[in-house]
């Protein structure tokens, strides 16, 4: 909106501004819709805090009135363990199906991170979660269960093109997984 105001004040016609904006890509990794040939939508977002996850899930709910929301989410290793149960609670509360998986586990075991996430949920809530440690497998399975009109949100890594495991950054790109 600010860009529109500035360019218009410089004498550029609104029609030309609208035309230019229609071809502009959004911010990579922020509510980024990945164009696929499927009848469901895949969105990638960097949401790696409880607030960010809640905000992007609210956005998904606003644009997706009829289909299911399927959320793939993990939490980073060697980072604030206190947010893990909060992230889990938000994902389960705001999604129809949830997959817990790896993010950047760093020096922690993925299963330990997932267990910290599960600790924030009741037994009934845990029944709505599928835990798949391998992020690629979790993404593929989430897409496999998606149906027409659903939105698959892949949260946590956004624009990142690596996964940090035991001090090594391995090439990993959520978008590449979706497009294969």
Language model segments and positions:
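ATP-dependent carboxylate-amine ligase
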Residues: 2-180
